[in-house]
C-alpha cells in the first residue's frame, strides 16, 4: 500500500466515545497488509485519549510491553517538544541512549537524528521483541496505523 491519502480517516463516532461502552481498543501498525506491531488496551471506562496508557495494556506484540512495565512515556500526546505522538518509550538519556517501542513522528523538528525523515508522518516501531535504541536506526517504518474499537 502506498501513502496516497492527503488526510487521515477518523470515524465521527469517536466524538461520542463515552456513549459506546467500549471494551477494548487495538492500535496496530501495518507494512502493506501485514500487521507488524500492536497494543491491545482495556478501554472500559476510558475516554478517547486515555485508553492508550500503560496501565490498560492487556496484550502487545512486544513481550515486555505490559500493564506492569516501566516507561518514561506511554501516551497519545507523547513527547510534544519532538512531535512524537502515540509514543511508547522505555527510557530517555539523551539521543544516543533513548530506547523505545513506537512513535508517530508528525513533522521535522530539531531533535535527535532519528527524528529526521524524508516524509511525514512516520510510523516507527521496534522490530525486536523489546525496546530498541532509536539511534541504531534499526526500527521499522510502517505504512499506516489503524485503531480498532471493540464494543
Model-derived regions, located:
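Mature extracellular or lumenal effector domains of secreted proteins
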Residues: 1-151
Amino acid at each position: 500500500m502506498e501513502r496516497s491519502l492527503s488526510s487521515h480517516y477518523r470515524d465521527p463516532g469517536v466524538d461520542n466515545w463515552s456513549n459506546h461502552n467500549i471494551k477494548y481498543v487495538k492500535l496496530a501498525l501495518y507494512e502493506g497488509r501485514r500487521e507488524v506491531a500492536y497494543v491491545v488496551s482495556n478501554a472500559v471506562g476510558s475516554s478517547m485519549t486515555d485508553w492508550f496508557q500503560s496501565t490498560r495494556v492487556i496484550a502487545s506484540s512486544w513481550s515486555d510491553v505490559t500493564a506492569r512495565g516501566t516507561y518514561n512515556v506511554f501516551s497519545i500526546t507523547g513527547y510534544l517538544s519532538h512531535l512524537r505522538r502515540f509514543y511508547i518509550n522505555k527510557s530517555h538519556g539523551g539521543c544516543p541512549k533513548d530506547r523505545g517501542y513506537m512513535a508517530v513522528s508528525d513533522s521535522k523538528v530539531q531533535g535527535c537524528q532519528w527524528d529526521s525523515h524524508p516524509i511525514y508522518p512516520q510510523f516507527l516501531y521496534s522490530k525486536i521483541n523489546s525496546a530498541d535504541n532509536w539511534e541504531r536506526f534499526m526500527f521499522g517504518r510502517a505504512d499506516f496505523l489503524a485503531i480498532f474499537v471493540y464494543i
